């Protein structure tokens, strides 16, 4: 009876699909002695730390310890490693791809783990927050820009000049290319957060709708099995999106690094 009451209260006070994305303090400490210093652990910080902890556990489980035959964890991680390595090397080039692959691999695992954690019911989707994804995208684009200037100097601005551009259209096209280059900061982070955010909101709306149907009577309970099956299928689709968005993020990152290195 208490469980049912708590469930009813949950859907009553969490009717908004945006409630699940609120950043809240899990633990907070106020220290007036140090000048009203507020120390807190938020839900996004907690789940990001949990993601790092899970990553450590997965790496320990996938370690072969010099065994000839690896376990299922090591085989899956090696397959993922080989797939990403092929993508990065083909996207950049065999030489520079080896240099930047560790960073891109760590970035992929970080995004993927946090995407999957967000799929767990009553957890927190860290990658649905624009503050996190924009921090990643701005840092990556800024780093690629610094890399380009470090290698090419002022010649890096030739990236903004399209090949075979007529002289009369040069100012306009350079302006368009410059705006397009700046838009990378927004588009890279926006794509990831928007896909995760929209998927979780839709699942929340469908779950609330299904719950209201199934608690309206015995007949409606069986009718609610239809949208419940759709929710289960859509959850499987969201798992696929979690992998796809992580892959898209690192593919675009590899492309930005390639542009900075090769100026095209």
From Swiss-Prot:
<feature type="transmembrane region" description="Helical">
    <location>
        <begin position="99"/>
        <end position="119"/>
    </location>
</feature>
<keyword id="KW-0812">Transmembrane</keyword>
<dbReference type="InterPro" id="IPR035908">
    <property type="entry name" value="F0_ATP_A_sf"/>
</dbReference>
<comment type="similarity">
    <text>Belongs to the ATPase A chain family.</text>
</comment>
<feature type="transmembrane region" description="Helical">
    <location>
        <begin position="156"/>
        <end position="176"/>
    </location>
</feature>
<keyword id="KW-0138">CF(0)</keyword>
<keyword id="KW-0066">ATP synthesis</keyword>
<keyword id="KW-0999">Mitochondrion inner membrane</keyword>
<feature type="transmembrane region" description="Helical">
    <location>
        <begin position="238"/>
        <end position="258"/>
    </location>
</feature>
<feature type="transmembrane region" description="Helical">
    <location>
        <begin position="41"/>
        <end position="61"/>
    </location>
</feature>
<feature type="transmembrane region" description="Helical">
    <location>
        <begin position="129"/>
        <end position="149"/>
    </location>
</feature>
<keyword id="KW-0496">Mitochondrion</keyword>
<dbReference type="Pfam" id="PF00119">
    <property type="entry name" value="ATP-synt_A"/>
</dbReference>
<comment type="subunit">
    <text>F-type ATPases have 2 components, CF(1) - the catalytic core - and CF(0) - the membrane proton channel. CF(1) has five subunits: alpha(3), beta(3), gamma(1), delta(1), epsilon(1). CF(0) has three main subunits: a, b and c.</text>
</comment>
<dbReference type="InterPro" id="IPR045083">
    <property type="entry name" value="ATP_synth_F0_asu_bact/mt"/>
</dbReference>
<keyword id="KW-0375">Hydrogen ion transport</keyword>
<dbReference type="InterPro" id="IPR023011">
    <property type="entry name" value="ATP_synth_F0_asu_AS"/>
</dbReference>
<feature type="transmembrane region" description="Helical">
    <location>
        <begin position="194"/>
        <end position="214"/>
    </location>
</feature>
<keyword id="KW-0406">Ion transport</keyword>
<keyword id="KW-1133">Transmembrane helix</keyword>
<dbReference type="InterPro" id="IPR000568">
    <property type="entry name" value="ATP_synth_F0_asu"/>
</dbReference>
<feature type="transmembrane region" description="Helical">
    <location>
        <begin position="217"/>
        <end position="237"/>
    </location>
</feature>
<dbReference type="GO" id="GO:0046933">
    <property type="term" value="F:proton-transporting ATP synthase activity, rotational mechanism"/>
</dbReference>
<dbReference type="GO" id="GO:0045259">
    <property type="term" value="C:proton-transporting ATP synthase complex"/>
</dbReference>
<keyword id="KW-0472">Membrane</keyword>
<comment type="function">
    <text>Mitochondrial membrane ATP synthase (F(1)F(0) ATP synthase or Complex V) produces ATP from ADP in the presence of a proton gradient across the membrane which is generated by electron transport complexes of the respiratory chain. F-type ATPases consist of two structural domains, F(1) - containing the extramembraneous catalytic core and F(0) - containing the membrane proton channel, linked together by a central stalk and a peripheral stalk. During catalysis, ATP synthesis in the catalytic domain of F(1) is coupled via a rotary mechanism of the central stalk subunits to proton translocation.</text>
</comment>
<dbReference type="GO" id="GO:0005743">
    <property type="term" value="C:mitochondrial inner membrane"/>
</dbReference>
<protein>
    <recommendedName>
        <fullName>ATP synthase subunit a</fullName>
    </recommendedName>
</protein>
<keyword id="KW-0813">Transport</keyword>
């Amino acid at each position: 009876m208490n469980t049912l009451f708590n469930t009813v209260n949950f859907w009553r006070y969490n009717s908004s699909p945006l409630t699940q994305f609120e950043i809240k303090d899990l633990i907070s400490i106020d220290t007036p002695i140090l000048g009203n210093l507020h120390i807190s652990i938020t839900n996004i910080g907690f789940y990001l730390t949990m993601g790092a902890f899970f990553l450590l556990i997965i790496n320990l489980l996938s370690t072969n310890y010099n065994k000839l035959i690896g376990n299922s964890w090591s085989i899956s991680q090696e397959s993922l490693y080989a797939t990403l390595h092929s993508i990065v090397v083909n996207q950049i080039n065999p030489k520079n791809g080896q240099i930047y692959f560790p960073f891109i691999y760590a970035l992929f695992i970080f995004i993927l783990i946090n995407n999957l954690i967000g799929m767990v019911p009553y957890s927190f989707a860290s990658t649905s927050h624009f503050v996190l994804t924009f921090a990643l995208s701005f840092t990556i684009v800024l780093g690629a820009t610094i890399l380009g200037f470090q290698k090419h100097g002022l010649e890096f601005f030739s990236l903004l000049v399209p090949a075979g551009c007529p002289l009369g259209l040069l100012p306009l096209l350079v302006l368009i290319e410059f705006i397009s280059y700046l838009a990378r900061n927004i588009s890279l982070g926006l794509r990831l957060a928007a896909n995760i955010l929209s998927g979780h909101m839709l699942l929340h709306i469908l779950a609330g709708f299904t719950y209201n149907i199934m608690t309206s009577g015995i007949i409606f309970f069986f009718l609610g099995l239809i949208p419940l099956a759709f929710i289960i299928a859509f959850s499987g689709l969201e798992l696929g999106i979690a992998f796809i968005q992580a892959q898209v993020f690192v593919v675009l990152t590899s492309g930005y690094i390639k542009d900075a290195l090769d100026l095209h």
